[in-house]
Amino acid sequence: NNILNEKTLDIFVQNQVQIAQNELENQKNQALSLALMFSKNQDIINNLEKNNHIELKKELLKLLNIIKTYTKNSIDIQIHTKYLEVFTRSWEDVDFGLKLDSFREGLVKVRNSNEPYVSTELGKRFNIKAIAPIYNHNNLFIGSIEVIVDFNPLINRLKGLGIDSMILLEKDYLNIATYHSDNPKLGDYLILQSSFSKNLLDILIKNPNFLKNDSFYYETDEKVFTQIPLGEFENSSVGVL
């Protein structure tokens, strides 16, 4: 009976992990679709080529206002030059000209491959980043556009499917992910979003070994805990779901 129950639980956890991974892929694909669509926007292309920060930002804000009529998800957009420098951001007016190639692996990948790319990537923030190359009318690479989506839609979607979850970032990456420096800590991690049950956090505080990856899952009387790796930086895990 115990062996049978264990096998049943193994299958259950595997199924729940697959559900979570599928939902994460859905979020990433939605972000990538937006990035690809915006990369063809003629106003974005022209303003980037003419080095017009102000008009380009106006266009980004206009697009985001249109998107808000269809979704409650929080979306940010960043434009980069062909040298992987910050050109403009929808959410702030700082860091213009900042070179990003030293810590933004996704940007380097897009520039080198000329292919779009989406991942859970580390930057000043840890979130879903979808990047598409931008080409001018001569089909020359002039920069890239990045659609940034936080994890709250994923957490809320999983909650609707009966899965309590939270996003944890490795504390070692705070020197890069400076935006999260004031986030609450949990063991060797930082908690990235607040839309999870207090019960989930209380159990993890009482059972710190659940944060380790020594077992496929951990079990209490009321919950089963497992984790899914999120993102990589220099071949090391950045965070977990």
Predicted features by range, described:
Residues 36-37, 76-83, 165-173:
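Short hydrophobic alpha-helical segments used for membrane anchoring or interfacial signaling
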Residues 68-148, 156-158, 214-219:
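Extracytoplasmic/periplasmic ligand-binding sensor regions of membrane-associated signaling proteins
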Residues 47-53, 137-147, 157-160, 165-171:
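Membrane-proximal N-terminal soluble sensing/regulatory segments of transmembrane proteins
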Residues 1-55, 65-75, 115-116, 160-164, ...:
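Juxtamembrane extracytoplasmic/periplasmic/luminal helical "stalk" adjacent to the first N-terminal
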Residues 9-11, 51-61, 108-114, 202-212:
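Short, positively charged
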Residues 153-222:
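Intrinsic low-complexity, intrinsically disordered coil/linker regions enriched in small/polar
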Residues 56-59, 63, 103, 154-157:
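Stable alpha-helical elements in mature extracytoplasmic
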Residues 141-150, 224-241:
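Short, hydrophobic beta-strand elements of compact beta-sandwich sensory domains
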